[in-house]
Amino acid sequence: MLKKLFYFVKYLLKAKWTIRLPKKNKYVLVDGNYNPFIKYIKKENFTILYRRGEEINFNILFKCLLKFKFSTLDYCAEFIKHVSPKLILTAFDYHIIFYKLSKKTGIKTLMIQKGARTNAMNESKHYFPKNSKNFFYVDYALLFNSTVKEFYSKKIKGKFFEIGSFENNFNKPNLNKQKKEVVFISNYSPDKNGKCENEDIVAFYLSQLAKKNNINFNILPRFRKNLNILSKEKLYYNKILKNNFKFILNKKKSSYDILQNYKFIFSTYSTLAIECLAKGSRAGFIMIKSKKNPVYNFRFGSFENLRQKGLFWTTLSQVNVAEINRVFNFVIKTNYDLWIKKTKYYKKKNYEF
């Protein structure tokens, strides 16, 4: 109880308070941390409902208090009622409050899946409590694949559509103009929670194999737009790679725009890498992590119940050079027709495109 109270007070103190009532608009975007809808809808047609403590509207909160309504759901509903939108949108499919908004406000909701799902969500009662389908509802849900559709149809009522990655569908690469270079998508983390266990080891073996095959080796840093953490990330890899790599530091381009210029993409686990695979790029997944690692369930194919090892992926608890070589060689050396034939099933299993 005290922990929750402390968190609540910290939340209130950290937030930016605004007195001006939210702008009446066509759309309310729940969570302004990510907005892929901007490609379709003009920025001025959105009013953002912040939910991470970035901003609290004093007038909306005061209205809730006058009505003796004290929950987060009440605040969200009061905010939306004032804006009076035609549609409520979100790009975060794991925010459970969103699934109560349609019935609470009488306004239609649309959710898109942002990232790959894992079995951790399936097993956790935090996301979807028992019998959640009785009180969770979304009017429209745009999802990656049939496996995710089946999962959500058991947890939520609504209409579900398999479209692949919403944002990825806007970025189709010209495969004939791609550089024949290797890019490793970094999952570096400055936190001491073990998430980036062996990220540097995987990068090291990939760099050695790239060098052996006369291919340039690059790393797409996770924190290229955060200079403070970026320096730590570069140091992390430099300790083992000794500057034998290139950090891709273009801040103006999105990760999608950067990666579509490269032919060979590798990662330990990454929604971005799966999206590259769906678009026709060569993608390989090499995870070397203990089963106790908090991201172990993020391995390629985990949610889709694929084996731990396959043509272009492997999941290891310790270094296995032969396995790393096998995955690398399949991604790099398989001819085009065979690659398309062998990966077709797995592309559809993970992503529509």
Q: What residue spans do the PLM features occupy?
A:
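Catalytic binding pocket for nucleotide-activated donors in carbohydrate/polymer assembly enzymes
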Residues: 138, 156, 271-346
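Short hydrophobic segments within beta-strands
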Residues: 29-31, 112, 163, 184-185, ...
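Nucleotide-activated donor-binding/catalytic signature segment of Leloir-type glycosyltransferases, i.e.
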Residues: 234-251
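Conserved catalytic-core segment of nucleotide-activated headgroup transferases in glycan assembly
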Residues: 40-44, 165-237
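Active-site and donor-binding regions of nucleotide-sugar-utilizing enzymes
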Residues: 4-19, 27-169, 272-273
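A donor-sugar binding/catalytic signature common to diverse glycosyltransferases
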Residues: 90-93, 113, 152-153, 252-298
